[in-house]
């Protein structure tokens, strides 16, 4: 009986789906297979219809699954066998194709070797043929040269002369080539009469060169570019083209035009000579006479580049020769005239002119390179044209830029400008408010070049031509604007001109910065560091040594020689304030401009930092010395004011108080006037000026200490304590307006402790204890307590013991 009889249709269909290779999960297969084995009950539940039937169905299913498994296994084995057979066939075909490709590759190698052998053979054959042809030509040429030589030996060079007369380019070119070769041959021949033959050949060569140049020049005048190119090529073959290049350059209308010549008088009348010597005006970007020449030159090059490139076989050589002539003649002649005029004006005019010239030349070279590049010439950094232009410019400037001469001029100019700007300061130091005769002219002359100036007390100044120098010297503007001649009698010098002036230094630093920038333009990188170092040292010497430090030393001398019985004139505090500003400008300039400056080496930077550090240290030390001397001088005068009143004693009875009233009023009035005088001076010079605040604090502290010491000069009775309190209150009120917190605190502390002098002896210990609880130190308590006239012996002994344990007070 077939197992399928135990299966229903749905189960058979399910098994057939497996046979059709439909993938069904095992769990789903079992559920679908078992669905037909259950019956649905009335309550909706399912119940196995028959156990035997179910067993038979599962047995039949298992049998079918085994049969299906066997069939699938047979198929797998069939597929594996077929796959193995296909793989074997593939390997066989692959090996066969590999062998064929190897054979083809070997044949290709043999073929390539054969081709290379053939190529090598052909090349060798070609070279042999070329050598044979060259030998044939040399033989023919040698034969021709011998024939030509014999013609010259006989004195009748008919063949070459016929070539020359044909007016045919190829024949003329052949004539030039053969003549050049013949000349070389004749120099090596050593036969009888060979010198005469050589002379005839040389004469013929000169004849050819002269006529070819004439023909070239005729074509140039037409102009006929094709004819110029023809004769240019002939001359290139004849002598390398040197003569034709010279002919072209020398005959160029740029060099022979009459309008290129400018009169010396017209050049000297250029308004630029009113600007260049004046440091207060900006440096002009160009000099008109050079600018017009450079513009015309650029136009000529832009127009002739195409002609030169079309006519000459080696246009770069022609351009180099052209530029050499331009820089070495046209520009040099014009530049020498300009610099000669500048030299006669002043060192500053010369240096500024040179700076403008160098900037203009660099722009010219850059413009020429741009023109050449646009015309198809190579102007890279290492190209012949670029190197030639740079070299011509450097050679042109060599006579004008020599490091020692430049530095000498720059230092002389800066030194002269600085001294002229301090004219009124210097004059006041010599003759107070009366100008020193001849001083202004002596300071102006170094800035006027070769100008012949009147000397002596009758010097006159032209406000039109010398106005800028008078402004530098700080002469009144109304005199300069008058446009007339003035003498030193017109000049007013006031007391305020005797002080340091930070604005003068600020202007001078600007001139120094211009010199620094000029050095970076004119001086090579190898020498720039040395030049900058020299200029910085000059700046330090002029500002610190010759100006600031000298003035501080003068102030110190004034204070030390001052009569202590008279009020100290603090006019010099203006110089302290200006000194601080000057050193601020100096420091900022070195740190922000000089040290980061391009071209400064590490050693130069260290040197600059050392200069700055040394300058600040020296000036600060000098300022502190002035402060110290000022404070002591003010204290000395206060001591003189207080000395007549030291006879006033606070150890007095109530009956004696009235007798001291008039004397005490005189003391307070004199002290009040003196302290107000000092305070008003500080206030007038600047109540919030940081450069004077430290001095004001030191002065107030010193004065307070002296007044307190004066108040504590004697023993105090209970009645005298009231007078002492009044005096301390007066001193406090006088110094309170100074706004010094430490001084104010000191007086308040003393006033709070004065009750120790007023209470009776029996309550003194209790009052002392209260002061301790209030936070007053034992030292402060004892400082006041020791003034009591009636201090008990036990407290005196205690004070002496404690005083021995305390460190000595510093002044």
Swiss-Prot record:
Domain of life: Eukaryota
TM helices/strands, residue ranges: none
GO cellular component, one term: cell division site
Keywords: Coiled coil, Exocytosis, Protein transport, Transport
Coiled-coil ranges (or none): 106-147
InterPro entries named in the record: Sec10-like (IPR009976), Sec10_HB (IPR048627), Sec10_N (IPR048625)
Pfam family, one: Sec10_N
Gene Ontology BP annotations: exocytosis; Golgi to plasma membrane transport; intracellular protein transport; vesicle tethering involved in exocytosis
Function: Component of the exocyst complex involved in the docking of exocytic vesicles with fusion sites on the plasma membrane.
Oligomer status and interactors: The exocyst complex is composed of sec3, sec5, sec6, sec8, sec10, sec15, exo70 and exo84. Interacts with dil1.
Family the entry assigns: Belongs to the SEC10 family.
PANTHER family, A to Z: EXOCYST COMPLEX COMPONENT 5, SEC10
Name of the protein this chain belongs to: Exocyst complex component sec10
Organism annotation: Schizosaccharomyces pombe (strain 972 / ATCC 24843) (Fission yeast)
Gene name of the encoded protein: sec10
